[in-house]
Amino acid sequence: GDDEPAGAGAATADVRIKVSAAASLKTAMEGYGARFTDARVAFSFAGSDEHAAQIRQGVRPDVYAAANTNLPEELHGEGLLEEPVEFATNTLVVAVPAEDATVRTFVDLGDDGVKLAIGSRTVPVGSYTRTVLGRLPAATRRAIEGNVRSEEPNVSGVVGKLTQGAVDAGFVYASDVHATGDALRIIDIPDDLEPTVTYGAAVVNDAPNPEQARAFLAGLVGTDGQAALRGAGLGPKP
């Protein structure tokens, strides 16, 4: 914790914990990991669903952090995780290239010729996107769905398509736009369509280093973790 004398982490720094985290957490987790003194941290960033599949297949990281609460709850129910905690929030947005004005408002997404990238159905960002589309009038939804040119395995893939100029717009998190500096611009999703985006994490059952894993999780919901999340453009724990 914060009250440890300087250098207290050095004794345990030979312990290395593995953290499997959602792609949208890269900036935040690396920032927090640098402040965490109880162990060295090795991160793996991918779609939350991809990490969940690996854990179900027997891969044992110390900590699993997802961009939703469903997956941690499911894995907990299957006896694969300890009790999950909610540690961050985010906002789903439409991102467009900062220099490109093809899409100016949310309703433009259904215009002829607009090219869209979204997350695949199984990844949280794709699931949240489909929640938004499902709240639209049928004709509007069909027009937008008809403009989807790419379904990506994680949010980093959507950001990549945008920064490469391969698409005109994409559904990502506000923190992803924050992470690109000035490359992308946010178009807000109307409030009545906006889903609640909450991140859940848990210590993995049979984790190699459960003590340090629990300390990592405690710090994530504590001052250091919340500061790193805020600095990366995510919202606080609910």
Question: What label would you give each PLM region?
Answer:
Residues 59-61:
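Short acidic/histidine-rich motifs immediately flanking catalytic phosphotransfer sites
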Residues 79, 83-85:
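Central helical "cap/lid" subdomain
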Residues 2-34, 49, 53-56, 66-69, ...:
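Exported/periplasmic ABC-transporter solute-binding proteins
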